[in-house]
Structure formats: C-alpha cells, structure tokens
Amino acid sequence: MNAIKRFGSAMIVPVLMFAFFGIVLGFATLFKNPTIMGGLADQQTFWFKFWSVIESGGWVIFTHMEIVFVVGLPLSLAKKAPGHAALAALMGYLMFNTFINAILTQWPHTFGANLKKGVENTTGLKSIAGIETLDTNILGAIIISGIITWIHNRYYSKRLPEMLGVFQGLTFVVTISFFVMLPVAAITCVVWPTICLLYTSP
C-alpha cells in the first residue's frame, strides 16, 4: 500500500505543472484570436509574434512529456540521492531510445520500421531529444524510469573495491543501466509494434 501511495505521489509531481502551462496556452490562444483582439492579432504585428513565442514555450511540457515523467518520478521514488536518480533515469531513457534507433537502423525490415522515411511519415515513431525511436509514449517513460529507479535504490550505495571506487554511486547505476537497457530496447522493438497494432485496430 505504501508503494502505491509513493507511486501516486510521484505521478502528481509532473502533472502539477500541466496547470500552469495550460493557462499559458490559454492566454496565448486568447490574445492571438482576431475575433477578440481585432487588428492587434494580425499575424504581422509585434503583438501576435510575441504571443506566438509565449505559446511555443507553453507547449514545452506537452511536447517533451516523456522526459518530464522520466526525470520527475525518481525525485519522489528514490530512497536516497533523488537528484542522482533523476539524472540516471534520464541517461537510461536516452540509452533506451538510442538502442532502439540503432536496432531499427540495422534491421529495418525485421521490425517493419523504416527510419529513413522520417518520423513524420511513419506511424508509431517519434523523435525524443533528437533521437528517432518508437513512440512508447508515457507508458514507456514510466516503465524505464521505474526500472532505473529500482536499479538506483538497489545499487547506488554499493561499495566497490578501492581500485574501482570511481565507478561507485551514480556511475555504477548508469553502468548497470547501460547493460539493462540494451535487452529492454530489443524486447521493445519486438513487442511494441504488436501492441500498437492491437491498440489502433478497430
């Protein structure tokens, strides 16, 4: 029960920011509406361009929602050094998507995903932090963040031999995550397209 409560609290951390950015988008849309603002909202005016810039900033949390959840969850779920846990989760998520990109690049026909067409022209793909990868959306982010947080909680305080002391703490967590993310990425390449087909089929 305590674990469920902690997970619920962790999920709330990123969600709480949605309200602010939603308000920003609401004001930007309102002030760019010619019906309300008249000629002031003409596309060539400074007013329109200014609120277009504000609007672009308002979309940041929704455009990068996966990264927000990946970083946000460990801040509440890590038993110690939550900052290091968040950084490890971010690194793990980037490695996960980079491995997926490399696998799909090397075996495009096996997994039915051609990255050469670009993410805009291919269903089920997305660019995350500049990495073309499978669109595992929030679910993928939560799973990867959970795995990395578990690794962090288990191995962050692990004492290594003195000659390997430089690899303790955060570095050790990231090292383990590197080798864990490779099979996780491979499994995702096999399983996720099937899940997408089941989800999108009528």
Provide a role label for each language-model segment:
Residues 4-168:
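Early transmembrane hairpin of solute transport permeases
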Residues 25, 178-179:
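Short amphipathic alpha-helical leader/targeting segments
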Residues 152, 183-194:
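Hydrophobic alpha-helical membrane-associated segments
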Residues 153, 175-178:
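Alpha-helical transmembrane segments and immediately membrane-proximal extracytoplasmic
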Residues 172:
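Duplex nucleic acid-engaging cores and interfaces of nucleic-acid transaction enzymes
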Residues 199-202:
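Conserved small/polar residues in nucleotide/adenosyl-binding loops
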